[in-house]
Curated annotation (Swiss-Prot):
The keyword Lyase does not apply. Residues 41-431 are lumenal. Its cofactor is Mg(2+). One of its GO terms (cellular component) is Golgi cisterna membrane. It comes from Homo sapiens. The keyword Chloroplast does not apply. It is found in: Golgi apparatus, Golgi stack membrane. It comes from the Eukaryota. InterPro entries: Gal-3-0_sulfotransfrase, P-loop_NTPase. Its main location: Golgi. The gene is GAL3ST3. The chain crosses the membrane at residues 20-40. This is Galactose-3-O-sulfotransferase 3.
Length: 431
């Protein structure tokens, strides 16, 4: 056979082998996808993320001990719900308040380990409101605990505090016509240090973090610097509410969680009629001036947050955040219909999903399940949108019945929410 024909025959054989190889690979891929499809939970399964780990290290198991300092009006309820659901899926114990504290750890008192219900000790996860006390948390939580918190831009946060706590904070009740502008024009005319719930009217972030909210960085810059150092010594991650999805990407990477573990529904959100569409610049400046300690904390940790993003790779974090948003939309559609809408509490038929309303002047929105139904998917969707008080009560009942033993999940029961009462590790240490 002429050489040219021999080369042609060899080339034909090579092409046939490649086609066979591609066909085998294709069939294997389809088979794998079909197999995975049979195992799909209600959480969307994502292909492995393309972002590299934060450090060149072998894969870590998911970290199971987390303390989240839930600050006020910072999207903390949504983060809490993420942690509650993670704890349930992994059969972890969640620290919950003693009944005398209701659904917060006796806030605004300094946290004490005695505020924790005995049926929820020793805990893996803590995520309810408290005023930070490092020594008491060290007594309660395991040494491997990772500490995280979240901050929000002080002007936007203060507008939310003023609206939400208008009927509870004496300083806010004194303001004619419930006018935020009037309060910020002369806050000293309405504010009285030491009054019950006074911390909601002045430097609330600093107070939640265990600081003295009456200090002013203009008069004592060293105090702000010292408070920042204390926060940095304890918290491995300070999330930023304005960059919520990016914060969750950093959180899941810190804890070696999957992106599925941080999917969420936005909780405890006010109706548009209950909030300012936009805070005027002059009002924002006045709010930051009055809450100068909070402004200093936020500005510092906002800058720190973006340094974390840069170390992780900004393009990588943005890509993961986009994947998170897409997966979240799929999840919400699956649970609440093609157009999931936040609804007023009066329009929510499912009692377990009716959010508590702080006053007649504020509408807190929630979700509802489309029609009846039962089974794991409905139960999971219910937990995704369950308000804080109902979920806390449910977990407490479950953990009390468990009595330390690992029991099967129980169904969620109706439980109308009550009115509210008035050196740690820098990162994960093993599994």
């Amino acid at each position: 056979m002429p050489p040219i024909l021999q080369r042609l025959q060899q080339a034909t054989k090579m092409m046939s082998r490649r086609k066979i190889l591609l066909l085998v690979l294709g069939c294997s891929t389809v088979s794998l996808l079909i197999h995975q499809g049979a195992q799909l939970s209600w959480y969307p399964k994502l292909f492995p993320l393309s972002c590299p780990p934060l450090r060149n290290s072998p894969p870590r198991p998911k970290h199971m001990t987390v303390a989240f300092l839930k600050t006020h009006k910072t999207a903390g309820t949504t983060v809490q719900n993420i942690l509650f659901r993670f704890a349930e899926r992994h059969n972890l114990t969640v620290a919950l308040p003693h009944p005398s504290c209701e659904h917060q750890f006796c806030y605004p008192r300094n946290f004490s380990a005695h505020f924790v219900h005995p049926a929820t000790r020793p805990p893996h996860v803590l995520a309810s409101h408290l005023r930070f006390d490092r020594a008491e948390l060290e007594r309660l939580m395991p040494p491997s605990t990772v500490y995280v918190t979240i901050l929000r831009e002080p002007a936007a946060m203060f507008e939310s505090l003023f609206s939400y706590y208008n009927q509870y904070c004496p300083a806010f009740r004194r303001v004619p016509n419930a006018s935020l502008e009037a309060f910020l024009r002369a806050p000293e005319a309405y504010y009285r240090a030491g009054e019950h719930f006074a911390m909601f009217a002045h430097n609330t972030l600093a107070y939640d973090l265990g600081g003295d909210n009456e200090r002013s960085p203009r008069d004592d810059a060293a105090y702000l610097a010292g408070l920042i150092r204390q926060v940095e010594e304890v918290f491995s991650l300070v999330m930023i509410a304005e960059y919520f999805d990016e914060s969750l990407v950093l959180l899941r990477r810190l804890l070696a969680w999957d992106l599925d573990d941080v999917l969420y529904a936005k909780l405890n959100a006010r109706a548009a009629s209950s909030r300012l569409a936009a805070i005027p610049a002059a009002l924002a400046r006045a709010a930051r001036t009055w809450n100068a300690l909070d402004a200093g904390l936020y500005d510092h940790f906002n800058a720190t947050f973006w340094r974390h993003v840069a170390r992780a790779g900004r393009a990588c974090v943005e890509r993961e955040a986009r994947e998170l948003r897409e997966a979240r939309q799929r999840l919400l559609r699956r649970c609440f219909g093609d157009e999931p809408l936040l609804r007023p509490a009066a329009q929510i038929r499912t009692k377990q999903l009716q959010p508590w309303q702080p006053s007649r002047k504020v509408d807190i929105m929630g979700y509802d399940l489309p029609g009846g139904g039962a089974g794991p998917a409905t139960e999971a969707c219910l937990k995704l949108a369950m308000p804080e008080v109902q979920y806390s009560n449910y977990l407490l009942r479950k953990q009390k019945r468990r009595g330390g033993a690992r029991a099967r999940p129980e169904p969620v029961l109706d439980n109308p929410p009550p009115r509210p009462i008035r050196v740690l590790p820098r990162g994960p240490q093993g599994p």
